């Protein structure tokens, strides 16, 4: 496997200015520039999952989400960019077409498996791998849900800079 997201690192933009005779240093961590699909919280979650995958000797990451899941979209893209396998479990055994999101996932090499709504309800927040999932795949619930999903926000690295305040933009 090649580089991970954490090795890649986001750009820091400098918007420093002077106000009332005092220098104000304003730096912006531009995680949105990492990749058009995998950035921000997805960059942090998937970077953490990559480390867990490597430490556990897994070949890839499996997760679940709906037909328009941003999480599956980002996971498939990350697998494509960084050379690891991905699998997505999606509710809707009876769909005869794939959404544009799932078409992208397939284009980036994600193996898609359609499951019933009942199966999806059982696995969406499961901590253990669903029955039948290959043992060499690291399992993460819907949206990347896991106990450690909040850890990435503790991993903010400002390249050795001391910061007084951190402001976070949210696009939910």
Residue ranges and their predicted role:
Residues 1-172:
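PLP-dependent amino-acid enzyme catalytic core
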